[in-house]
Amino acid sequence: MQNIYKILFFIIIALTFSVDSDGDGYSDKIERKVGTDPNNKSDRYYYGFWPFNLNKDKIRGAEIPIECPSNISCECSQNSDCINNNCQKTLRGEGPYCTPKVGDIFPHLIATDQYGEYVDIYDLGMQGKTIVIEFGAAWCNPCKQISSWLSTGDVSSLQNYSWWKEEYRAIRDKINHDEIIFVTILFQNESRENANHETVFNWHEKYPNENVLVLADEYRDIYFWLKPSGYPCINILDENMKLITFTGRGLSDAFDILSDLKPYPN
């Protein structure tokens, strides 16, 4: 009987902490913590309804701008120079640099979204969901076609690519059903100038999807961290912001996992 009371107690506590009186996606506990009105849906932390992570300080990724030496993106000559013991040349033969690898924590980016708000990317963590990071540019045609598909569901422009698989259609459904978190980070506009709020605002206007967070890599911090050699460059993170995949170009590994063609690595 005591066990039953304990179970009921924990259920009541859990329900108390998950109450969302105004239905804005933020629990009353979070709203009281951040100072928004738990009974007013229009008074919320993020206009875009992005998650809020009360425990984001526990994510120990590198702060931006990245400080050298030793951190990922810094120059190196041997593995021991790097905090992650991974000194590599880029696919273009540049470097070597301390290079990201699976298990590394994505850096602590705070950037402007399509609604003009600064979003802390660590707020996406600890939500029990996979986080998809698409890195690209506004001039990148495949990036445009992927965002068009995510907006409309039309895959016709993607079916001409050799890397496209019909199983990838499931990814859009997972995004729209809030099963995964999808982030598009743009580092350049159509004129190949540094991205800013106008860049991501225009992107969202062209390819609207309220479930896709679009961020501007205004100072190229993520560009220098990833050192991509092709676009889009898509990787996935676990809920602790650790890389599940890492590539400097392409999307196949990430999309194969997201569409259940491959299992999540142990």
Residue ranges: model-predicted function:
Residues 2-10:
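Sec-dependent signal peptide recognition
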Residues 9-18:
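Hydrophobic h-region of N-terminal signal peptides that target proteins for export
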Residues 17-101:
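Extracellular calcium-associated, cysteine-rich motifs in secreted modular proteins
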Residues 23, 126-132, 176-183, 208-213, ...:
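Loop/turn elements at helix/coil->beta-strand transitions in domains of secreted/extracellular proteins
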Residues 110-131, 165-175:
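A short beta-strand-turn-helix
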Residues 135-167, 191-192:
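Conserved redox-active cysteine motifs that mediate thiol-disulfide chemistry
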Residues 181-185, 193, 197-231:
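Short, internal strand/loop/helix patches
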Residues 229-266:
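Thiol-/selenol-based redox modules, centered on thioredoxin-like
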